[in-house]
């Protein structure tokens, strides 16, 4: 039926396919690998399939690190993505139930993720590139609270006191942690925390950085430093500052466009994160 052979009647095919759908059945495309029980394939779960993901310098660098170690271990990579959560869940289901991959690496971390819930319940090998609140989930991550603290303190030690923070969506743990570090640094140095100086983008886009910069400097023209958690946001901030001839220092995180005139950047070792991610999931599988 699955192969649509002509020797099977249409009525029989219809009944079997209906049963497959009700049973949530997915064909195992790697049955030929039953002898070894390994597919030699790792699945990568992307946060979305938009151009924004591929434009962000962080992810290609991570992917390069993963691909390097995968190749060294004779593994292939399969990408699971979709335009929304439902499509991504379907892609993951096919990988897990069809045993198309040996394990999964999530290239993002967010609260109450139904995809993570699925693989956890199925006890399928997986790893999160980022943070998890569960002690039972394997992960690879930087100390983003400390990174946010250090970035903020860098400006404070240079005499800045009206420091803005422009980050991604608060659903992402990385945004939450860097914001926490930012707030801790302000508190430790007895500087006031003004919510009008913190902004959160639902997408990492240059235009978001530009838009937030406009709002920021209309609110406080004396803002003396800007921290962005992403290089695309930083690009938008720098474009706004250049257009309005504002000499305000900007700091961003890893994989920064060398054309941007940044005061500093935080190296989050994206290539090493990718390499370590594959090494870790490989150990889990074996």
Q: Positions of the model-derived regions?
A:
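Short, well-ordered beta-strand segments
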Residues: 43-45, 164, 227, 251
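N-terminal helix-turn-helix DNA-binding module of bacterial transcription factors
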Residues: 1-40
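Flexible loop/turn connectors
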Residues: 214-286
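Hydrophobic alpha-helical segments within soluble ligand-binding/sensing domains
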Residues: 140-165, 180, 206-214, 234, ...
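Secondary-structure junction motif
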Residues: 165-184, 235
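Short beta-strand elements in bilobed, periplasmic/extracellular small-molecule ligand-binding domains
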Residues: 70-81, 183-210
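Alpha-helical recognition/docking segments in bacterial nutrient-uptake
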Residues: 37, 41-44, 48-153, 216-218, ...
């Amino acid at each position: 039926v699955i192969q649509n052979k002509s020797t099977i009647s249409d009525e029989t095919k219809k009944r079997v396919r209906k049963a497959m759908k009700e049973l949530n059945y997915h064909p195992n495309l790697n049955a030929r690998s039953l002898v070894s029980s390994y597919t030699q394939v790792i699945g990568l779960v992307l946060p979305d399939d938009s151009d924004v993901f591929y434009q962000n310098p962080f992810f290609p660098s991570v992917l390069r690190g993963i691909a390097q170690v995968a190749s060294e271990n004779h593994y292939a990579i399969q990408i699971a993505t979709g335009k929304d959560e439902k499509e991504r869940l379907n892609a993951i289901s096919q990988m897990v139930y069809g045993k198309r991959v040996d394990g999964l690496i999530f290239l993002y971390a967010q609260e109450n993720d139904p995809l993570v819930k699925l693989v956890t319940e199925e006890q399928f090998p997986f790893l999160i590139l980022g943070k998890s609140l569960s002690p039972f989930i394997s992960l690879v991550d930087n100390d983003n609270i400390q990174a946010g603290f250090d970035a903020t303190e860098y400006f404070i030690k240079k005499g800045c006191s009206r420091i803005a923070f422009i980050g991604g969506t608060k659903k992402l743990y990385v945004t939450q942690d860097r914001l926490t570090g930012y707030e801790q640094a302000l508190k430790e140095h007895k500087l006031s925390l003004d919510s009008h100086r913190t902004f959160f983008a639902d997408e990492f886009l240059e235009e978001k950085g530009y838009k937030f910069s406009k709002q920021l400097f209309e609110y406080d023209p004396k803002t003396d430093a800007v921290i962005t958690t992403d290089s695309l946001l930083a690009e938008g901030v720098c474009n706004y500052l250049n257009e309005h001839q504002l000499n305000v220092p900007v700091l961003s995180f890893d994989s920064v466009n060398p054309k941007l005139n940044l005061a500093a950047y935080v190296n989050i070792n994206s290539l090493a994160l990718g390499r370590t991610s594959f090494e870790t999931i490989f150990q889990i599988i074996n």
